[in-house]
Amino acid sequence: YKIPTGEFHLNRCTALLNMFLMATYGEGKYVEAYHDQQIYLNHKLLEQKQLNLTEVQEKSADFLMQFSGVNEAYSAHRLLLGSWTPEIYRIRNGYHRKRSGDLVIDVLPGWTIVSENGNENKVVRHSYIPAPLIFMGHSVKPAIIQTPVTIDHIAPTLAHFMRIRAPNACTSAPITDLR
């Protein structure tokens, strides 16, 4: 099988994005920082040049989509106000509007995200990897459950066992087959 793979260098990507924005809007350092597939734009420079942040984010996302290995590029505006799909839902759950970047890059499966700053490289995998989920405790009966469980079932299940209210952000029901 010939699965398409490659290396995605985020530092090179941000350098090219900054050059694209300079060609479009004039001189300046538009990309302030990047970390963990997120790109942070220089908001002070955008305000100084009286540029619309949403427009710059959308143009940047469209430009990033042209890179090899990029599956999707999401702007902060699209994540906060866009339509809900399973892919956006997964990324939206890890997004915080005050701390996360202006652009989030989703790399194709099989591609390696190369970190020039550190020594760790991240291989992107979107395939299902089965792993056991084990609950142990006084009132937990031994059982094997055949229903699929996602990570967002864990917090409400633990709260259910401890007989406390589930966290406010819980969207899933607890696993009740264990009692």
Language-model segments: residues:
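Second-shell loop/turn segments in exported
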Residues: 44-51, 141-147, 161-163
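Sec-exported extracytoplasmic/periplasmic mature domains
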Residues: 65-69, 159-167
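C-terminal, low-complexity/hydrophilic appendages and adjacent surface loops
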Residues: 99-100, 108-140
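Beta-strand elements within well-structured catalytic alpha/beta cores of enzymes
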Residues: 105, 133-135, 154-159
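C-terminal beta-strand edge segments of enzyme domains
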Residues: 164-177
